[in-house]
């Protein structure tokens, strides 16, 4: 096993966890104060235990203090609507994936692992700049350039829909 996965505990990352469990040595969740962290991180832990994958939680409390996003402001602040709607921009936590991938990369290299898995997907692109293919490619290049072991990103959901991820999850008997 040569990989680390960034796992929130949501549908996308849990599906990725199961789909590539045979490659994953370590799972990392980040507690950055998002409204959903207290629900999703325990799911991540449960699924990692089921798969016998070591799971760690990295606290990023500073993000809630210094970053602005409705995801950090309490559930009443989060707008409802479609991903592409303008009002959904308030849910962006600036450079969240960049921060998490940077930390995950350092942890991966420190543990002799070769790649970092992340479950960003096509539906995220409309609103989250750090989920777009261009960002993932640039971050992959930066990580490879900045590590002795050429640590890369594996993001197989980048160009597929959430519906497709749900279909994959269903095939894996995830509900």
Give the positions of each predicted feature:
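Nucleotide-activated chemistry modules centered on ATP-dependent adenylation/adenylyltransferase
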Residues: 1-175
